[in-house]
UniProtKB/Swiss-Prot annotation:
Gene (name only): MIA40
Protein's name according to its UniProt entry: Mitochondrial intermembrane space import and assembly protein 40
Native organism: Mycosarcoma maydis (Corn smut fungus)
The keyword Membrane belongs to this UniProt entry's keyword annotation: yes
Keyword Transmembrane: yes
Motif (Cx9C motif 2): 183-193
Pfam families, per the entry: CHCH
Transit pept. (range): 1-28
Length: 247
């Protein structure tokens, strides 16, 4: 039981490290300007992204861009927005004026949302068009990988570009379960190359070390829990044996 838990943790650790590096590029990054993202920000995105081993396989099918629906809600009428700020005395003094102008205010409430709603819809359309223009390094229709995609942040052309290409393509085309578990060796070669160039891949190295520390802590906890479970089972079996003997 204990060994199976440690094997599962080790496999999950390898896949999670692979997915942390590759999933941001596979999902695509929206580009709102002609110039691509800076190298530092692109490299940092690999360090920030993290997914669980179970969700890695499903994430492969989320490569194409999706646009989110935006609900357009009219703002509150001007008079209603002022109501909470009115003092009690002011409300009494202006009661008559409010009564005389009530029809006009009701009309404003009906007209104002009509004027503002098209603006909100226009914004939603613009954002939807921007999301449609998102780029992804992998095209599931053609099965090709665009190594020049800005979402890769130049990783395919850096000092460890060849190692990155091997690991990334292995992860993309992997049919193993969980996805990418058969790319551990290529991923390790890429990580070793990163450590040979700490001036370029400082963020990746620091993030990997932090992830290793976290996984080691989790494995230690799993081992401790496994020992506790084994001890508990031994106690229960011993108690059951004594009860059977006395019976």
């Amino acid at each position: 039981m204990l060994s199976s838990k440690l094997v599962a943790c080790s496999a999950g650790r390898s896949v999670q490290r692979i997915s942390r590096t590759f999933l941001p590029a596979m999902r695509g990054v929206a580009t709102k300007a002609a110039a691509g993202p800076s190298r530092q920000s692109a490299l940092s995105s690999y360090s920030i992204a993290a997914v669980t081993a179970i969700g890695v396989g499903a994430s492969f099918y989320a490569l194409q861009s999706r646009s989110s629906a935006i609900q357009c809600e009219p703002r509150q009428a001007w008079h209603d927005r002022l109501k909470p700020k009115e003092a009690k005395g002011d409300a009494t003094l202006h009661k008559d004026a409010h009564t005389r102008h009530a029809p006009a205010e009701v009309q404003d409430e009906r007209v104002e949302p009509v004027e503002e709603t098209p603006v909100a819809i226009e914004v939603a359309v613009e954002e939807s068009e921007e999301q449609t223009g998102q780029q992804s390094a992998y095209d599931p229709e053609t099965g090709e990988i665009n190594w020049d995609c800005p979402c890769l942040g130049g990783m395919a052309h850096g000092p460890c570009g060849e190692q990155f290409k091997l690991a990334f393509s292995c992860f993309v085309y992997s049919e193993a379960e969980p996805k990418g578990i058969d790319c551990v060796d290529k991923f390790k070669a890429m990580q070793d190359c990163f450590r040979e160039h700490p001036d370029v891949y400082k963020d990746e190295i620091e993030d990997d070390e932090a992830a290793n520390a976290q996984f080691e802590k989790e494995e230690a906890n799993a081992k401790s829990n496994g020992l506790n479970d084994a001890a508990q089972e031994a106690v229960e079996e011993s108690s059951g044996g004594k009860e059977g003997a006395s019976a």
